[in-house]
Amino acid sequence: MSAMSANDSARPQSSSEEVPLLEIRDLEVSFRSHSGLVPAVRGVSLTVYPGQTVAIVGESGSGKSTTAHAIINLLPGTGQVTGGRILFAGQDLAEAPERDFVALRGRKIGLVPQDPMSNLNPVWKVGFQIEEALEANGIAKGKAAKVRAAELLEEAGLADAESRLGQYPHEFSGGMRQRALIAIGLSARPQLLIADEPTSALDVTVQRQILDHLDGLTNELGTAVLLITHDLGLAAERAEHLIVMSKGRVVEAGPALEILQRPRHPYTRKLVAAAPSLASQRRSSALARADIREHALEVVGEAEQHGEIGVEFGKATDDVVVATGLTKVFKIRHGLRKSTDFTAVDDVSFAVRRGTTTAIVGESGSGKSTVAQMVLGLLAPTSGNVVFDGKDVATLDRRETLAFRRRVQPIFQNPYGTLDPMYSIFRTVEEPLRTHKVGSKAEREARVRDLLDKVALPASVMRRFPNELSGGQRQRVAIARALALQPEMVVCDEAVSALDVLVQDQILTLLNDLQAELGLTYLFITHDLAVVRQIADDVLVMSAGAIVEKATTDEVFNSPREEYTRKLLDAIPGGSIRLGA
């Protein structure tokens, strides 16, 4: 079914709103390469009515953003519309000259792009950038533009808007930058707003605030929204109609709830199954996790019987890591002589059971990543200690530190940033083996092949470089490297937050499988409670540097004690939509 037919069937035929605001018919978009035109969007049709929110959902490379950018003639590189029609308020934009788009962009069609740091000029004050948009669209200039810019920032939910006008983008948090882009996107009161992954890089609580505010503004102004996202749960919660895209084509379209509860296409079913925001509700997620924990503990038990655990530090304990009274205070300098103390972590205590996963959950700035760095021995605590297998990490000598590095390995958020772009995949995975003088050259190569096989990558990727791999493949390489020295514990710091939901699901499944097979212990850092149900046994909820709740995963999801935990649960996109078991 095309998106157009799905939408039409759901609208009353006699309504005065029957005339669509945006109607795309059989859109074709291609990119020119050395070998000719490469199709990116194939025969896409969709309809958006005035005041309606329609979401296009799909993984990276599905063509969803390309479709959106074709509407306003902002296709990157060699992209061009090669067929079909884009009717906006009766005008065919597929045939329109550039001068028509200059008049349309901002005034009639607004855009909120994905990455606010890349889309705000770092050398211009935020106020100037909003004023520039107002002037370009003929709304206001001079003092009037400044007054209006402050009103728009306030409207977008920023407190003390007038003083914010004089700040630069780097002085804003991610959520504040996104609000500034919303202010720019809605500054000319457009009829249609294209929101391209507007919250994918933000914490779930900030995401909810931003989307709630966007909903409120667009409802008040009567603006139609075309929402681009990879998260089916978020799309179903925010949009009336969904369009599911895969490989440049629309594979399913229709009313949001209907698609979510009764998906027909195999790809849509895969998206519904993969989205952590939806899987977090399912009892099956908890049952699968219990099974993995049981397998991992069996492996740990066998290793203990054979004396393979705790060799370097002495006898193994049930708790592989015990943190007591962890506190970290940073000095914030003001000029040459003045400084103030900032407490990032405040008296945090917890234990991680061997063969299990403990998740630390909290918003940005809660202190969770600082705790992870102290557990890894990368940051010295101001007070308190981290004990690994009965030994204080801060007191390790050089030999013990090397042993600790082998036994505890990290996986970080951005796989591209943590892989050397000049190293081949083979050299990347082999490096820890070479550094720790493990095996001969031939043995190391065999080990790399085995590691790549464990993370479901073909041996052929060994000679490739990070820029030749997708985000999910790069994260698999990072996992292979972390496992090279056969660690007992892996610290995953936002290891899936930068990935599409399908790739997220694949990586979470891989981490679970590896834990069951190797008896690994995980400390999993995340801002998103949705992924916790699939990966964790115990949960620590952090806020403002302190632990506000400690419980098992089931207790957190079924009977949270703290208001802050309930707030995080409520912020899970699509969490209110019932899917059954």
Label each PLM-derived region with a short phrase.
Residues M1-Q281, R293-A581:
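ABC transporter nucleotide-binding domains
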Residues L287-R293:
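Post-kinase regulatory C-tail/linker adjacent to protein kinase catalytic domains
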